[in-house]
């Protein structure tokens, strides 16, 4: 039994450091969500003249995962200088599998072009943002703000596999030739 679920946690704390009691604070929040989906689908394609060359029905199962992390560390020095670090991480992943049966012209055979198509797909994306920010009070009326960041995006989308199996006298058989596909 697949049950949708979600978890999250957050917290923070402030400490005072040294004889000047300079505040150091941090905050963290994290979350994880998993959602499942099930759909009945119909796939139909025609030529420009209206001839149906694909007419399939099937079921698709999908799992969607989302993860989030946010963090902050902040330090004040003598109420004049300020340094902070921020981190954000977002991850999103989806995987699905669908089985479709019916007519497809790729199944050229004696069984009225009937067969089974299995389509599997994975999408995996990650974003990471790092920031370092500072504020320096040089005088009562002059300050310096500076910042730097390093960010990273990784996308593995899509990783897709399509397998076609044609109807045969004793069940199904794997098609020959270029009918199996893999995209990455």
Where are these regions (language model features)?
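Transmembrane beta-barrel wall of Gram-negative outer-membrane proteins
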Residues: 1-99, 125-130
